[in-house]
């Protein structure tokens, strides 16, 4: 799950082969003899078959919220992937580990969770004020623990900050996208894309973005524009909200009708280096999203925009 989360975060799309682990296809084992998921095969044939490595690769392509720069995550990830997962497996799947004490592993896991929760008393995220790779790498395992012991997880007073932290991930619209399912893949069969509710953005037509005049003037001084939409920065949202021409009027009415001086930026998508992906909003309509800053040189022109435009 954390690998898919990072692909979503980075604005990437991949061919999706859902694997039935009891019947691993030969094509998977040819790519990675480990026989574990995830396995990411790049266009040059490079194989990445560790979830943390997939996360780091994805965020190296685009990291709009700066997860890789938010702090040193390695120690927490090592604790999660080592000691915590050890106790989680033996607590959740006791029947697979004869002779192991479920209660002992529960107590040990809860001590680790309490330590993480203590961190969250001081800051919103595990490494400080901003979300980091550690948060993204750990939350799916904390969710597994809660599923294994919902009453104990909810009742423990020490875990209140951790529960609030976990719920930020579970309540985010991206969680529903992570939970999308596909039928097990077979050679020659259908190969959907992930995320399933997104599509590529055509590069042969312009994109548009509505910007407050002051924000655009500041961007021209710095060389990059980093606002997602009115009042929300790229680092907060994770992408810059763009529109196709026929969507501009409704976007203006929703976000900018009372905003004062507004400019319509026309963007050349071929001059963008950050990933572009058309994502579905709750109504199902697709909007183009830019998963990185907008360089000034990619803006073909800008004109004042109002409800009369």
Predicted segment positions?
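Short amphipathic alpha-helical face segments that pack within enzyme cores
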Residues: 1-5, 140, 247
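GST-like domain detector, emphasizing the conserved glutathione-binding G-site
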Residues: 1-110, 117
